Regions:
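Elongated, amphipathic alpha-helical interaction scaffolds
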Residues: 1-315
Length: 315
């Protein structure tokens, strides 16, 4: 949740999910990540799919309930078959992310397996005892599931990229341990991605340059351009810029000038730098945390939530 003012409270997950639900944007992201920007996945072929992959696992006498809900899931007809495409939005580094995504994919396969087994049982068409016991006929096949994790954080991802990065493996066992490599995209390190959709290109380009403080580049590209206020809201949400979010909300449903918003962003950055310096200096001199929090609230006109967020970030 980003609390920008007394009246504006923005839920990050909701903003990002709404942005990616658009088929053209969703398809462009997957094409850029999986197919080097080639138009393989067609927006018109995408359908909404159930995001809830939760399941009940039964192992012997033990039963375990697992819950997994992806942010956005689409089904796509690829050739003559179907592909399930999942998207996970991540604001912070997560040191268990490969395992989380692997479990999500596995639950997706389990869900389809159980649906097929249920249908087979109802129809009762078995060619062998083995098919009956497994609930799965020899010719039955699951559809591939591809999940992408988009990391929106300002820090470079220094967590694991694959399951084996999370394991302590003796050298001799490494070649025989099954791995799971996640499809991770970092917004701040996304220059190599070839986007075709202008909305996706704008969000990644502006957010990346804000993270890297390349304000001059943003001014050069967007000086004469206005962007949709929805994109401004997404960019402000990704970069956690309260001024940019407020600027976008004031023009809801309209267009906004990025250069004007950029000036507000610079001013916000200057104020944050002052707050950071004050907090760190006060901590160095042994000033009580609660006194510092009260002081920045009073000096910079912050509400309690904003002051607490700065304290958490810089104390």
């Amino acid at each position: 949740m980003i609390n920008t003012s007394g009246k504006n409270k923005i839920k990050t997950d909701t903003v990002l999910k709404n942005f990616w639900r658009d088929n053209a944007r969703f398809a462009d992201l997957f094409n850029a990540v999986l197919f080097n920007g080639d138009n393989v996945i067609k927006p018109e072929a995408l359908e909404e799919a159930d995001t809830d992959l939760s399941a009940i696992l039964k192992i012997g006498s033990h039963t375990e309930t697992l819950q997994k809900i992806l942010d956005v899931v689409k089904k796509s007809a690829y050739g003559v078959d179907l592909v399930i495409l999942g998207l996970e939005n991540q604001q912070h580094i997560h040191f268990g992310m490969p395992l989380r995504l692997m479990v999500g994919d596995a639950l997706g396969y389990l869900k389809e397996y159980e649906e097929i087994a249920k249908k087979n049982k109802e129809e009762g068409h078995w060619d062998s005892t083995e098919e009956f016991l497994s609930g799965f006929r020899r010719e039955d096949r699951l559809h591939p599931m591809v999940t992408i994790c988009v990391y929106y954080g300002e820090k470079v991802w220094d967590g694991p990229f694959s399951l084996t990065d999370m394991l302590s493996i003796p050298e001799k066992l490494k070649p025989i341990v099954n791995d799971y490599k996640m499809n991770l995209i970092q917004v701040r390190e996304s220059e190599q991605l070839r986007f075709q959709n202008p909305d996706v290109q704008t969000v990644f380009d502006v957010s990346r340059n804000i993270f890297k403080k390349n304000y001059g580049r943003i001014e050069d590209i967007y000086r004469e351009q206005e962007i949709d206020s929805e994109l401004g809201l997404v960019i402000g949400t990704i970069t956690e810029s309260k001024e940019l979010i407020n600027h976008a909300l004031e023009r809801k449903g309209g267009r906004m000038n990025m250069c004007t918003a950029l000036e507000e962003l610079k001013n916000e950055g200057i104020q944050e730098g002052k707050i950071e310096g004050y907090i760190e200096a006060s901590k160095g001199f042994g000033v009580a945390r609660e006194l510092v929090e009260e002081k920045i609230q009073e000096t910079y006109g912050l509400n309690a939530e904003q002051a607490a967020a700065y304290m958490k970030k810089y104390w």
